[in-house]
């Protein structure tokens, strides 16, 4: 069979009582609901708190008008409120969305599960139908094959008959032919013979035609057979395809289910992510609340500062303020201590909540174990008296050992049964896996639902906390009410869990009872005839049990109600005002409960009456049947008398218990529960006895019916009588043992009372010692206050030192200023030297100019002489030519001199520009330094004023330490020496802190001494509690509650001690870290950034100075190193600040939890001293309104001081008392943990054994599956071989048909060969028929074998079902197993017969190979395949037999073990019945002990009431600490808002920087366009120069006279040569003139281009400087709000941009003006000039006009320059020397700066 052919089994797995995660899933559901509720409640709580805060702030705003800070805070709070409302809506939407998503996934899972079941059902139906169709098809195929064989036989017979006829006719023809050959024959005879021969030939032809028709029919039938074989093959192929399709479809559904599982996992992950996101939001809200609290503290400080200023106006007020500040410092220290206590309390509360959850899980686990033990005891011992005897020392060892043995035996039975179930459910493995996957989906769904439930529960918790914050006045009453609700809720949950477990247990009990009844039915043969009557008796028993269960449930409800009332009564005793009313109400309810209990008692009596009626009826029947047996009558009468005596005793016991319930209260309820269990067990025993009596009646009836078997029945009755006598004797022994136990318990109780009296005396002595210790602690605290005052004075001295250090820093800054002035003087000296050098250079230049002037004068003289000698030109032509040559040589020499001077001048101009640029930069840097220096001095002065104000305002230790840290940190950043001093001072602080820690350690040592004493007392109390714990199951429930409370308190005490030590060690450190975060972000980082700016500017200045001088290089390097160190320190500090910020946020929460615990400890005194509590509340209110009601504080301050001292004393006393109680609970919990660990180890050991057995069963199951798979594989291989054999046979058939046709053709030609072939054909046909018969027979056998294998699989399934029914019918299973063995033996015989038949087939095939050589190869292959098949079948048969034998041997062993265990259980039940009788006797003794226990229980109640009071007081303090936490959260939120404001300002600054950069880029592009335009102008000038080459000397001369002015300048630089253009000389040639003009224009254009490029570079440089400054300011703005500096830099940038725009506009105007003049030059003609040739005049005029315009522009720039001195030479013109002035230098410097900015912008792009 194939894997998918397995049908799903509907048999459920046998449940043995283990929990399959039901409780865990339920707990997770509730937890998810609680988490959702907590988150929702927290959001609502935050919204409500913000609304209240808005109301308060609005009230303050109405009181104090025109307060912008309050308006800002109100706006911030409104924004936060809207944000929280939106988050709450989003949370609701997400929750609903996830619920819808989960429901959709559930629907999908249900849909796919239904589809899967439907497909499985369809698959099963489809397979059944296909197998049926296949069987029908195979049957039809075999029928057709048989028909075909019959047709072939008929055809062969007809062919044989035709051949015989043909042979006969042929013989006749031959004979007639022989007669015709006789010569003696007559003509008539001859004719006659010829006619006969013709007829014979005609008949022969007819016969041949018939033979051909038969062969055609034979071929048609063969084709039909082949087509049928093909159809069969197609059917098999379709089956395989259908199987493949089904597998594919099945796999797709499995994939879809896996996808659904993945989706569910993803949704679960999404839920987890959402939960984490919500938790992050909650953390953010906490941080926001803390920030708000910090902001409120800042506001309070500002208000206190204002009050201090108003109070400092009068001197007498100042004197009073000094004293008040001292007291304020003390209060602040106490406030810090309370704050730390609150933090530690909050941490402890969180840990206690976690521990409560763990403890709840632990209780659930213990409850499961207890219920499991209870179920075991109900099944095995049929009594619950063992719980009472469990805590008794004498009976403890015996009951424990026997109970463990019973548990082990029953677990082994359960293990065996589970092993049988696992073996029997092999066929339904896939269905089980699918069921498990669906169960996993359900579990995941339950987990998701539970998560939502936990979230809802979290929301509810948040709402509760919010209501608690709103109702501060009713904190105590509401806390008590909430505690009651929580206790009631937990009790309800536990009751629900108990009911669920009880239902499961009842189901298991019913199943086991049913199983045991069936075993009893099979054990006795005579019970088969009495099934109807026994069924009636069983129904009556079940009805009675149901009624008894109803009564028990009612009693449980009454007990729970009574327990609740008792708890409320005990809790409300503490409330003095309402105690009387509640007592009356509770007493009335208690009386009503007593009445209901009486009604239940009446119902119980009615139940007993019904039982008595049934017993009477049974007695009547028994008397009628046992008239002949007087011995049996006497026995039954005595048993009835004993039963009545037991009933009377039981009634008396119940009456006594009911009387004692009024006194015992809550403890007596548990005892009444045990009495009910005892009555239930007695009733069950009575029913068992009645059942045995009915069995006796049945035996008596059988005696009447069957007189012959009377002796056998008498023997059975005698045995039953003996068993009854044994039980009666065991009951008497149990009564005696109970009486002995009662006496022993009385003795132990008397001893216990004596020990309690001794311990009370010891308690009194301990209380006296604790009072003395509290007084000592008070004295120690006063000493500590004195120490703090001394430390305060020391700190004032340190502050003075710090002021001195600040003055030293100022002195250092002044020294630095002087050093920079010295550097400036040196730079001035160097500039003076450079100026002298320039003057020397100017003197040389003047000498050259004098020479040029002489040349000019000579030129003028020459001109005069030339005009005078015009008439004499011819005469003096030769002299003129010689003179011309002479002056040409002289001009060439002067030209060389000009070029040299030009080079020198260019070098000098470059040096001059560089020096002036450097000088201007130095001046700017010096101005910037002066400004920064003034800013630093102003900042230092402001800092000094702030320090003075802070010293006058607040003398708190915390602020003084912070200022000290800031001053030391600034000192560290300034110099390395200051850093060392800071480290020394910090070391001193550490030493002081260690001294303080040592003082705290001394306190801890004293506390440890007290804890040792408390532990000793706890050890004694532990013995008392252990002794009380041994009193029985009647105190079990209450002891569990008390242990849970004790464990919580003990855990709280441990955590308090740990947190207290940690807090003492890190108290000052954490306070310093808190102030570091707040102050470093607001003040220290500002100072660091300012220092960094100064160092950066110094660095740039020093870099520039270093370019010119190397005097201060060492100082620069030292400052650079210092700056790098400070920058690293700043980065490290910023990283540490960020890390500490996150760390301290966590520490704030831990401090909050610690403070919460401390405040809970302090709140204990409120219950005992109501008046003092009211005064302390007034003091807290006065502390919160200290700023508004400061005058009233002055009067009441001394009184409050004394009250606080008293509060500290009472706090110490309460702490010591609490420590004692907690240490006692600690010892008790340790003992309980040891017992729990022992039980846990036992359970784990038994679990390991079960696991080992379960693994063995799984291995056997896997082996069986492997064998099944191997059988299936072998079956498929055999089927494949058979199909191959059938194909070979078909091939042989085709070959045989071909051979038959060849034989038929040869028969016509050769008669002799025909006979032989006919003989061979007959023989082959016969052999073929034999082979076909054998093949068909083999196929039938194969089919039978396959059917047998299938039947064997079906039988295995049937046997598995029968083995499952083995739990119900063991005897019937034995017979079925025997039948199975017989069937397997028959199958074994069938397999052997098949093997023999196959051997016979092999022999026949061997004989056939000898006759037919053509088929030897095929037959050998068939033989080999058959041999292999037979070997495999034999091997499979052997393995199958081995597996079956193993299984049945294992089943026999299991059956024997079950029978052995049942016998052991019977023996144990007998022993437990005997022990139960003893326990009944001991129960009577326990009734006497109740009176002695009452007094002790009252003492325990008083002690527990005290513990409850302590818990109530701690809850009150917890609420007050929650309020302080909320204030801290608000302060944290204010810090977050400040950070957000800083980020927003940074973003605005970045935007402005980007806009400025874009503007600079635009200006740069404009300058670049100007450069391009200058290049175009240069090209135009080049073209004009080319035109001037063609002009003549005369036109040039005339143009020069008309247009050129006497002074010509280019760009403000004096030209060294007076005549700039060579055409001024009429003696020179035209080529020289054009070259010189071209050179001059090129020089002019190059100079202008260089000037523009210099301006561009300057703009780029300035832009880089501005970007650096912007980056610095951006860094500063990320840490602090430096809007003022940003505005300054922004204004500077705007001014520079305006300057650049103005300069660029000037350049644009100049260039546009030049272009306009060039374009308009053609139309412009001066009046004094009339050119001769038009084209020459226009070109010359245009060029000269441009030169004039350029010269005018330069003159306009130099209009304030004086004209230099001129030395006359013998020439006609003189050019004065004009130098540069400071205004042009400044203008060039600004243009250069703009160019640098633009160039830097271009480079950055």
UniProtKB/Swiss-Prot annotation:
Superkingdom assignment: Bacteria
InterPro entries recorded: Cytadherence_Hmw2 (IPR016430)
Coiled coil (residue ranges): 28-838, 914-1591, 1632-1723, 1777-1804
Keyword Membrane assigned: no
Lineage: Bacteria, Bacillati, Mycoplasmatota, Mycoplasmoidales, Mycoplasmoidaceae
GO BP of this protein: adhesion of symbiont to microvasculature
Function: Component of the cytoskeleton-like structure which stabilizes the shape of the wall-less Mycoplasma. This cytoskeleton-like network of accessory proteins containing HMW proteins 1 to 5 allows the proper anchoring of cytadhesin proteins in the mycoplasmal membrane at the attachment organelle.
Name of the protein this chain belongs to: Cytadherence high molecular weight protein 2
Gene name in the database record: hmw2
Keywords, alphabetical: Coiled coil, Cytadherence, Virulence
